[in-house]
């Protein structure tokens, strides 16, 4: 099987994440997309929402799509979650699968700073999601396939700010995610 891997903090997951996964699934001819919420993201000092609640938010976001699932692999570690370690472990557990790591094309610029990036390039092919008309440089040694994406301006930061200001997030997040944010009183000031 060809599996797309979508890592992230997902604080909260939103329609942009789901659209990226769907576009990558179609364009890369993936059989499924696995969402990999980071328990302890290496690039952030802290998260707004607990790891357990973020995991539940991702589960709620993908539950209506049979081709999407959530992996808890990064929750098995007590240390920071590095993509290289996660990929190695997934390949060990599922040698019959071919994996593609989905990444925003804008993140290709910093890919060389990722933990063990040179070895990561050898481990996995990247599906780089590009905005219409965008140009990007592919790091030397990285195997990258472009995934076209319609322009969609939505971010987890914006969603948290909207909630804090009492503004609607309807249609920016899947309805089950919106309901959990409301029920748990997340992001409110």
Swiss-Prot record:
Keywords: ATP-binding, NAD, Nucleotide-binding, Nucleotidyltransferase, Pyridine nucleotide biosynthesis, Transferase. Pathway: Cofactor biosynthesis; NAD(+) biosynthesis; deamido-NAD(+) from nicotinate D-ribonucleotide: step 1/1. It holds the Pfam family CTP_transf_like. GO terms for molecular function: ATP binding; nicotinate-nucleotide adenylyltransferase activity. The keyword Nucleotidyltransferase applies. Its EC number is 2.7.7.18. Belongs to the NadD family. Catalyzes the reversible adenylation of nicotinate mononucleotide (NaMN) to nicotinic acid adenine dinucleotide (NaAD). This is Probable nicotinate-nucleotide adenylyltransferase. It comes from Exiguobacterium sibiricum (strain DSM 17290 / CCUG 55495 / CIP 109462 / JCM 13490 / 255-15). The lineage of its organism: Bacteria, Bacillati, Bacillota, Bacilli, Bacillales. The gene is nadD.
């Amino acid at each position: 099987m060809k599996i797309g891997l979508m890592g992230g903090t997902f604080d909260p997951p939103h329609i942009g994440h789901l659209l990226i996964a769907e576009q990558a699934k179609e364009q890369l001819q993936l059989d499924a997309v696995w969402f990999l919420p980071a328990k302890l993201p290496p690039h952030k000092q802290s998260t707004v929402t607990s790891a357990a609640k973020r995991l539940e938010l991702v589960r709620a976001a993908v539950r209506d799509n049979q081709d999407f699932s959530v992996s808890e692999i990064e929750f098995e570690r007590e240390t920071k979650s590095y993509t290289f370690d996660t990929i190695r472990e997934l390949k060990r557990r599922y040698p019959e699968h071919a994996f593609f790591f989905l990444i925003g094309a804008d993140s290709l610029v910093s890919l060389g700073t990722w933990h063990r990036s040179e070895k990561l390039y050898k481990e996995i092919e990247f599906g780089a999601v590009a905005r219409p008309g965008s140009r990007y440089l592919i790091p030397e040694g990285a195997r990258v396939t472009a995934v076209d994406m319609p322009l969609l301006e939505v971010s987890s930061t914006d969603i948290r700010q909207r909630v804090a200001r009492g503004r609607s997030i309807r249609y920016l997040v899947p309805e089950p995610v919106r309901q959990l944010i409301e029920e748990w009183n997340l992001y409110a000031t």
